[in-house]
């Protein structure tokens, strides 16, 4: 199993620099992105999708801050979007 973790310092800016082209070449089973700094509404377009992956986003409560996003080829057993859940 290949797992990739990456601090993107803004998923939208990283997408413009070729992040998703690179991710599709890496072919990791699980991709964990930190500091995505975007809401679900902001990353709905196809530019933020990866073929054969499901996406799970946990947004920061304050807009433009933090947030994590996971792309996975397999369905997770459980998804926790907050501590203690």
Residue ranges and their predicted role:
Residues 9-10, 85:
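Short histidine/acidic/glycine/proline-rich micro-motifs that form metal-
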């Amino acid at each position: 199993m290949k797992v990739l973790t990456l601090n993107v310092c803004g998923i939208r800016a990283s997408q413009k620099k070729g992040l998703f082209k690179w991710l599709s070449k890496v072919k990791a089973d699980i991709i964990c992105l930190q500091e995505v700094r975007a809401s679900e509404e902001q990353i709905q377009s196809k530019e933020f999708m990866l073929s054969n992956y499901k996406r799970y986003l946990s947004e920061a409560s304050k807009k433009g801050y933090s947030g994590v996003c996971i792309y996975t080829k397999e369905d997770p057993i459980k998804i926790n979007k907050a501590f203690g859940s």
